[in-house]
Curated annotation (Swiss-Prot):
It comes from the Bacteria. Binds 1 zinc ion per subunit. Zn(2+) binds at H581, H585, C683, H687. This is Alanine--tRNA ligase. GO terms for cellular component: cytosol. Keywords: Aminoacyl-tRNA synthetase, ATP-binding, Cytoplasm, Ligase, Metal-binding, Nucleotide-binding, Protein biosynthesis, RNA-binding, tRNA-binding, Zinc. Belongs to the class-II aminoacyl-tRNA synthetase family. It catalyses: tRNA(Ala) + L-alanine + ATP = L-alanyl-tRNA(Ala) + AMP + diphosphate. Gene3D superfamilies: 2.40.30.130, 3.10.310.40, 3.30.54.20, Bira Bifunctional Protein, Domain 2, Threonyl-trna Synthetase, Chain A, domain 2. Its cofactor is Zn(2+).
């Protein structure tokens, strides 16, 4: 293969398609224009979505581009693998009603082999399961059938980008890199093919045959014109053509690494060499492996951050900005492995800009602003990072000293609550120290803290301001999550205090604050109040007589009246509150629109984890109604309505149709929140700026809190992802446990009732939701219900089959039969046998009695069983004994009367039962005596 630079590969590709009459279209921004369903531009076709659907007039019918893209779905593995990046460039060629499959396949193969220089003999191809046409075309182009694989929808059906748009089956080109790149089992198994998880086959070109338009409900409609959408990752193509070990060893990324080498004094090649040594009991190799990952992470993240800020996406506490902030903080943390203790990312801006400025000149114009922004973010994070890292080192050492291998959830929560360490960051750090992370324990601690803040601090708010001079608190939180304020009141143990010291719990009142106090259903904010080393952790925020009280505890230092504090709200938590509060408004709008104006709000809880909404409605919602409501809310999210807030005289607010909360008291002026045509409500809470920020909405549960009212519990945004991840994790466990039980207890006989559902994993769930939005919500709802139904059906079939097998084993069990005969009574006319068992149904007793009668001609069988809630009895006899006067039906009726139940039957077979199972022994004994009297004439 030809060894070309990244810029040469880019130009070869674009010029090839330019010669094929394609318009060369510049890359669009990483900020998707007019598409609220996407956080970032994630593929080359994003800017062409309207052209595929025919929504706009075509300026051209074929195009080519090299598109800037940003994806964070695989963030945790970036730096650890040889091919994952968050930022990358996507080469692509596109047809809008022009050419289709044959030309697209021909272009892909011709460009790959004859212009880029790929070895045709090493190219493998995948096609969609039933795409015979594509396979036939590939064969005619010289790709043998044995190098063409058919894969399903997960691998070979693409799109849309977002929750609606063009989509269709696809065909991918893979390069066989040799058996040495395969996994441990691939070399010996001989089954390694495209689609295998190893690195032997690397996909480098994807051709999507756009034939459908998917609406927001997930329905597919034929496109008026078919289209072609191809994607070829530039960095990945460079990896293959340059024979590099990873994308980070390609020429452009390797140049960025060289800048870090200069700053750190550490040589990347030395790190790579040392990292290949066995890491077991080799500290040098482990350090090198960590440094290798660090070089790669900071190299990747600087590109993502630089290009994002260059396109106007600045670090923030929410949405896209939060992703960029997280990338900067992650890079800062990894930079410590390269001995960077001070801000360093900003120093690379000018040098990285020089690499990409020829292709993206806008970077040069914005480099100063980019540099300044990154420096400010690094300085902000480094303020708390040092203390947090010292603490985590202590906690890791404590864990290891105690002989444990799991880093406790309680310790992780301490880092989260005190130092602001995200759980995923702690997990990465402790993993490097060889410790597992107790996710469940962390979640439990998180929940306990929430419960504590909801209950403990609520009790303290009662009448704290009674007798105090009241100064109304100025609320800053609509526009900011941080700000300065002076202490005007302090409370300790429900009493006014002059100071609060380390370890003490209490409440602080500031003259102004960004902390939102509980109200309108929205729970109070949490966060920190700081002055230097004086730190007060806010666990809850409440309001009394227009005064906002911050309840919590002093973590360090001391607080006194008149101190000026820096107040900082927990941003990620507030973001989720905004999602759920705005989602609640849309839900209220959906209910009133779909169910009627009789719907009145009866109660509401807006928490970071979920929303709960009580409303007046006479009957339970049907499954169809729930889906309609969910769809209505998601459609309002998709429309990305601006969220407008304004203060109005209450009468003016009523005139514009603002909905008030039933039973709530309002002043002369009210705050109104409007979301397009979807919702207008009185509300003092915090909200998103556009409904599209919410992402998606899912109804978890519908129930009744009381007569005449209904309750909906739902989730928005990231909580939807977590809900489905938890739901499918539970389903996975249920499927595995059930299948294991079926296999172990039924052997081969249970193979037909095994649950064969393909349960999606957490990464797949996140990626699909982030990519497809509301469509994925419906998909996962349907899939989870389908799998749950399969589990229920298989469980029922398992119990039935197990019971049948147990019954069969019981009926034919020789030892049981011998035991029953061992206690037989010979009357001289015929034998009477009886027995009492536990938990046997009448059919099992009947089967056993039939087998007993086979052994003896003149036989009366009386069998009983004590079950969980009752007793059952079966009496049968041979025809010879019927002729002697035995009537099984009469005997059963007698027994059942003593059991407090009913029964009956024919002379030779009868059955019955009753709830008074404690009488079973005496009842059967009495039946034996009656039968003996009938057969022998002896009186009972």
């Amino acid at each position: 293969m030809k060894r070309q630079s990244v810029s040469e590969i880019r130009e070869i590709f674009l010029n090839y398609f330019k010669d094929k009459a394609h318009a060369v279209v510049p890359s669009s921004s990483l900020l998707p224009a007019g598409d609220p369903t996407l956080l970032f531009t994630t593929a080359g076709m994003v800017q062409f979505k309207p052209l595929f659907t025919g929504a706009v007039e075509l300026p051209y019918t074929r195009a080519t581009s090299c598109q800037k893209c940003l994806r964070t779905t695989d963030l945790e593995v970036v730096g650890k693998t040889e091919r994952h990046c968050t930022f990358f460039e996507m080469l692509g060629n596109f047809s809008f009603g022009d050419y289709f499959k044959e030309e697209a396949i021909d272009y892909a193969l011709d460009c790959s082999v004859n212009h880029l220089g790929f070895d045709k003999e090493k190219i493998w191809v995948t096609v969609y399961t039933d795409d015979d046409e594509a396979e036939k075309i590939w064969i005619t182009k010289g790709i043998p059938k044995e190098r063409i694989m058919r894969l399903g929808k997960k691998d070979n059906f693409w799109g849309p980008a977002g929750d609606s748009g063009a989509c269709g089956p696809c065909s991918e080109l893979y390069l066989d890199r040799g058996v040495e790149k395969g996994g441990p089992d691939c070399a010996t198994s001989g089954t390694c093919r495209p689609g295998c998880d190893c690195d032997r086959f690397l996909e480098f070109w994807n051709i999507v045959f756009n034939q459908f338009n998917q609406d927001t409900e997930g329905n597919l409609h034929p496109l008026k014109q078919t289209g072609i959408d191809t994607g070829s990752g530039l960095e990945r193509v460079a990896l293959l053509l340059q024979g590099a070990d990873s994308v980070y060893d390609t020429n452009e990324l390797r140049k960025i690494i060289s800048f870090y080498e200069e700053l750190s004094g550490i040589k990347y090649d030395d790190v790579i060499t040392l990292s290949k040594m066995p890491t077991q009991k080799n500290n040098t190799a482990r350090i090198a492996a960590n440094q290798k990952a660090a070089f790669r992470v900071v190299t990747d993240h600087i590109r993502s951050v630089l290009f994002s800020i260059g396109d106007g996406i600045y670090p923030d506490r929410t949405g896209r900005g939060y992703v960029i902030r997280r990338l900067i903080r992650r890079a800062t943390l990894f930079g410590r492995k390269l001995n960077f203790k001070e801000p360093f990312l900003y120093k690379l801006v000018d040098k990285v800009v020089e690499i990409y400025k020829p292709r993206y000149p806008e970077l040069g114009k914005n480099s100063a602003a980019i540099q300044k922004t990154i420096l400010a973010e690094e300085e902000l994070f480094l303020k708390t990072l040092e203390l947090g890292l010292e603490k985590i080192e202590t906690l890791v050492a404590k864990t290891k000293t105690s002989g444990k291998t799991i880093f406790s959830g309680a310790d992780a929560f301490l880092l989260y609550g005190t130092y602001g360490f995200p759980a995923e960051m702690t997990e990465e750090i402790v993993a490097e120290q060889g410790l597992d992370f107790d996710k469940k324990g962390f979640q439990e601690e998180l929940e306990k803290d929430r419960q504590f803040s909801r209950e403990s601090w609520k009790a303290n708010k009662v009448s704290l301001m009674t007798g105090q001079s009241v100064e109304k608190t100025e609320f800053l939180g609509y526009s900011s999550l941080s700000g300065k304020g002076n202490i005007i009141h302090l409370f300790n143990e429900n009493k006014p205090a002059g100071a609060l010291k380390e370890g003490q719990a209490g409440a602080i009142v500031l003259n102004k604050t960004p902390f939102y106090p509980e109200g309108g259903g929205q729970v109070g904010d949490t966060g920190f109040l700081r002055q230097g080393k004086n730190v007060f952790k806010v666990l809850d925020t409440q309001k009394e007589n227009d005064v906002i009280l911050h309840f919590g505890e002093v973590l360090s230092g001391e607080f006194s009246i008149a101190q000026e504090l820096e107040a900082e709200v927990e941003a990620a938590r507030r973001e989720r509150l905004r999602f759920h509060h705005s989602g609640t408004h849309l839900l209220n709008g959906a209910l009133r629109n779909l169910l009627g104006d009789h719907v009145l709000q009866k109660g509401s809880v807006v928490s970071p984890e979920y929303l709960r909404f009580d409303f007046s409605h006479p009957s339970a919602l049907t499954s169809k109604e729930i889906r309609k409501i969910e769809s209505w809310v998601n459609e309002s999210i998709r429309k990305n309505y601006p969220v407008v807030t304004k203060e109005l005289p209450i009468e003016d607010a009523k005139k514009i149709g603002a909905v008030a909360t039933f039973g709530e008291k309002y002043g002369d002026r009210v705050r109104v929140v409007q979301m397009g045509d979807a919702s207008v409500e009185f509300c003092g809470g915090t909200h998103v700026s556009h409904t599209g920020e919410i992402g998606y909405f899912f109804i978890k549960k519908e129930s009744s809190p009381g007569a005449g009212n209904r309750r909906i519990e739902g989730v928005c945004g990231p909580a939807v992802i977590e809900t489905f991840q938890n739901r499918f994790a539970e389903l996975t466990e249920s499927v595995q446990n059930l299948n294991l039980k079926i296999k172990s207890e039924l052997d081969n006989e249970g193979s037909k009732i095994l649950v064969n559902s393909n349960v999606p994993g957490p990464d797949e769930i996140r990626e699909k939701l982030e990519k497809e939005g509301a469509t994925a919500v419906t998909f996962f709802r349907d899939l989870s219900e389908e799998i749950a139904s399969q589990i229920e059906e298989s469980t029922s079939a398992f119990l039935k089959m197990k019971k049948s097998l147990e019954s069969r084993d019981f009926e034919n069990n020789a030892s049981v039969i011998e035991k029953v005969f061992a206690s037989s009574m010979d009357t001289g006319v015929g034998k009477i046998v009886s027995a009492i068992f536990d938990d046997k149904d009448p059919n099992s007793l009947k089967g056993l009695s039939d087998n007993l009668k086979v052994r003896e001609k003149n036989l009366l069988v009386i069998l009983g069983s004590k079950n969980a809630d009752n007793a059952s009895v079966v009496i049968t006899c041979s025809s010879q004994l019927v002729s002697k006067g035995i009537h099984c039906g009469d005997l059963v009726r007698t027994v059942c009367e003593m059991l407090g139940g009913k029964g009956g039957g024919k002379p030779d077979m009868a059955q019955g039962g009753g709830k008074e199972k404690q009488n079973l022994e005496s009842a059967i004994s009495f039946a034996i005596q009656l039968a003996k009297q009938t057969l022998t004439g002896e009186k009972v």
